[in-house]
Amino acid sequence: MFKLGKNSINNMAGIDGRLIDIADVAITLSNIDFGIPSTGGLRSEADQAKLFADGVSKADGTINSRSYHQSGKALDVYAYVDGKASWDKLHLALI
């Protein structure tokens, strides 16, 4: 059985408590270890704009294109495979 690490827990600061509860249960049921990346939780408008500029997000963070991350209503995860983060869809499907 897996459990969320200290960094993943810290990366969920400011997120809706219901999402935290879901992540806590999901990690115990998952077939593969996973974590929450540093940009996977609550984001400021500036953080969101940078992710958009880097091509990582489709939402630019402005009033017309806000991300649910900006209100704490979204959480990103990565699969933890062979000692490193993976965003491979095959790995993510196992979570």
Q: Can you describe what each PLM-predicted range is?
A:
Residues M1-I95:
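Cell-envelope/glycan interface and biosynthesis
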